[in-house]
Amino acid sequence: MLLLKHGRIEILDQNTMYGWYELPKQEFLNGEQPEPLTHYIKQFPLMKHVNPLENKKDACPMKWLLLSAPITNHWFN
């Protein structure tokens, strides 16, 4: 789950609600992704309207997707 919290984006575990990774909002928005996010939304169309806590079948692929996305810092390169 991605949450915007005090200007930061945080990825949370659906089961424990424990923060996995926190990244400044601007850095997240400037990060280069290998494919546009709309590509993944097309792969998982139900995720837009489904609560993953109620539907574990859809939560697993989305959690894998969020945790496997490359996050790079271009500010210091």
Curated annotation (Swiss-Prot):
Mainly localized where? plastid
Say which family it is in. Answer: Belongs to the ycf15 family.
Keyword entries, A-Z:
Chloroplast, Plastid
Give me the gene this protein comes from.
ycf15-A
The protein's location, in the record's own words, is: Plastid, Chloroplast
Example of a GO cellular component annotation carried by this entry? chloroplast
Q: Which organism's genome codes for this protein?
A: Liriodendron tulipifera
Highest taxon listed in the record's lineage: Eukaryota
Q: What is this protein called?
A: Putative uncharacterized protein ycf15
Pfam families to which the protein is assigned, alphabetical: Ycf15
